[in-house]
A protein has these predicted regions:
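N-terminal Lys/Arg-rich, disordered targeting/topogenic segments
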Residues: 1-18
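Signal peptide-directed extracytoplasmic domains
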Residues: 39-206
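Bacterial extracytoplasmic/cell-wall-associated proteins, especially those involved in peptidoglycan
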Residues: 32-44, 145-150, 163-351
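Sec-dependent N-terminal signal peptides
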Residues: 19-30
């Protein structure tokens, strides 16, 4: 029997162990790569199924507990239980383990699909366009245009309602979400996709009873303000209650998001939601809620379903003033003096 030196024996054993481990690692890597590369296809199937989904025969209608004409907010126990439950559209916007997985999956899938190398090796014609809640119409048009290489005229065509379109307003009805389009999708076809989703998610659930109490245009406008002002789903209904309180009292809303809308509409500022300075409060515009009482003439952005529901079902709060601190905490008060005191506490100055 040949006696190998210990070092040679150890080396031989090491080689015997490394080879299968290396093969296993390569196989696992190939499988993992295949799974990841399948993300865009899986997302496309899911989105196409939703885009082709027929509207339910009797879709669940949005509840409404505010009455602008009577200037009342009457909270309903059953509605509160629904809105605060796990299946609520408001809770659907909260960051949970499940929602984080969904966001991560969508982000990875769209990032891969947008990569030129993926388009070349996959030989696919599909593209993804993601619209986030709180975007104004120009941002939505730019999102589609950057993916589909539209020119200025095509972008304008997309945001201009056709005679037979269901698009009810120039703002506020570009439903947030991820859309699956082909490289040949026209502005008219893209508008149809957006309109169909808005019909499915909002119009089909906005019953005549609800519309008789709060007209759709009014609800979308309030919801757009909530969407731009909220720090998350937890304060949506509180902000809604404060907005309605100020409307009931015929107070100016004094919402900075409307100043951002005015500022970006009339100046070249580099982004659609620029910071505001005190001088912006004097900008002449019907959208300036510091100068004019009541709601702006149209929504200022496209709200989520959660914000629309919050607009229809505000919290019955005595608060008139509110702000978010630097940590995202929400503070509301019934008097301006209390409001200023809290601002000094958290920001070192009043407002």
């Amino acid at each position: 029997m040949v006696n190998l030196p210990f070092s040679r024996l150890a080396s031989s054993v090491k080689r015997l162990l490394i080879r299968p481990l290396l093969v296993l690692a390569i196989v696992c890597g190939v499988v993992a790569l295949g799974v990841v590369l399948s993300f865009p296809a899986l997302l496309a199937v899911s989105i196409q199924r939703d885009q082709n989904q027929a509207i339910a025969t009797i879709p669940e209608q949005f509840p409404v507990t505010v009455n602008p004409r009577a200037k009342t907010i009457v909270e309903n126990v059953e509605v509160n239980a629904f809105l605060e439950g796990a299946d609520s559209p408001l809770q659907a916007t909260a960051l949970t383990a499940g929602s984080m997985f969904g966001y991560l999956f969508t982000w990875i899938a769209t990032a891969i699909a947008d990569a030129p190398w993926y388009q070349s090796i996959a030989a696919v014609n599909g593209r993804f366009v993601t619209i986030t809640s709180g975007m104004r119409k120009e941002q939505v048009a730019s999102a589609f245009a950057s993916t589909l290489a539209w020119n200025k005229n095509q972008k304008q065509e997309f945001v201009t309602a056709k005679n037979d379109a269901l698009l009810p307003l120039p703002e506020g009805s570009f439903s947030p979400g991820t859309y699956f389009v082909s490289s040949r999708t026209t502005p008219a076809a893209a508008q149809t996709l957006v309109n169909d989703r808005f019909t499915r998610e909002v119009l089909s659930r906005y019953g005549t009873t609800t519309a008789a109490v709060v007209p759709l245009a009014q609800a979308l406008t309030v919801a757009s303000l909530i969407e731009r002002e909220t720090g998350g789903p937890d304060d949506m209904r509180l902000i809604s209650g404060i907005i309605w309180n100020r409307l009931f009292l015929n107070m100016n809303l004094q919402i900075d998001a409307t100043l951002q809308y005015v500022k970006a509409s009339n100046t070249v500022v580099g982004n659609w939601w620029p910071g505001v300075v005190p001088a912006d409060r004097y900008r002449k515009s019907v959208y300036n809620t510091y100068l004019h009482s009541g709601l702006p003439p149209t929504p200022i952005a496209s709200p989520s379903v959660a914000a629309i529901i919050a607009a229809l079902n505000p919290k019955n709060t005595p608060c008139i003033y509110y702000f978010h601190d630097r940590a995202g905490g929400f503070h509301c008060t019934t008097t301006y003096a209390e409001h200023v005191a809290l601002l000094k506490k958290y920001y070192g100055r009043g407002k």
